[in-house]
Amino acid sequence: GDMRDPLVARRVLAGAEVVVHLAADVGGVAYLAGRQAGAFHANHRIGINVIQAACFHRCRRLILIGSPCSYGPNSRLPLVEKKLQEGFPSGETGCYGLAKLVVSETANLFGNALGIETVTLIPGNIYGPSDHFECNRSHVVAAVLRRAVVSQLLGRKTFSVWGNGSATRDFVYVDDVARTIAQAVTAAHHFSGDVLNIGSGSETSVRQLADLVAETVGGGIEPEFVEEELVGYTHRVLSNELARSVLG
């Protein structure tokens, strides 16, 4: 069903004790840049519907999946949870980050009022199986990998990489994120509006990623950087110390 429909959300959450909110309208920087108002509206609406349904059913715990896009563009690295509200999400991906931030704060307000535990997990740049490889939806790992493979199949010696390669991200494998979510589901800790980063704690440049993809694909193919294209935030890396202390 479509979680933008509040009745669907209420039906999906019926009987749930713990809710993990993963539903989203999301894609890479190009996808969000092309529909900022629509992306904000959809993700805000989905989130509010989930919160209201969780409250209606008196669920015990609500786990939200946030976004590093919710941090301000000038936040000091590594990004720490207590700095989340010190900057305003902006740029091409700010619409998504703002929606996630508003939903998180709304969940905390309702949770405190009704005795529902709330926690927001903020993963880094997730990659792995079942990623979006579509041209207009992919994030950087899937996008770079797809362009490299397609270029090699077409007999080309280069593949395009957006930006100059200096932008950095905190890449985290999807299985690691899933394990952390599972830990949050079963944690003995009493959540009360907690925010926890989920990252590798390592800053990797897009150039490093492109070189690794080129080496993996093989055939002598090399990255060609296209500086005029969108890159989103310049540098991102998450501190995961709080998550380690809370979840182990």
Language model region names:
Residues 4, 70-71, 126-128, 141, ...:
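Conserved sequence/active-site signature of Rossmann-fold short-chain dehydrogenase/reductase
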Residues 49-51, 73, 91-124, 143-154:
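Active-site Tyr-X1-5-Lys
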Residues 46, 50-54, 106-107, 180, ...:
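Hydrophobic positions on the long internal alpha-helix
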Residues 40-44, 88, 92-104, 134-142, ...:
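Short-chain dehydrogenase/reductase
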Residues 150-248:
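C-terminal substrate-binding subdomain of Rossmann-fold SDR/epimerase-dehydratase oxidoreductases
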Residues 3-44, 53-56:
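NAD(P)H-binding glycine-rich loop region in Rossmannoid oxidoreductase-like domains
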Residues 19-25, 62-68, 121-123:
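SDR active-site strand-loop-helix element
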Residues 48-93, 113:
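Conserved Rossmann-fold NAD(P)-dependent oxidoreductase catalytic core, especially the SDR/UDP-sugar
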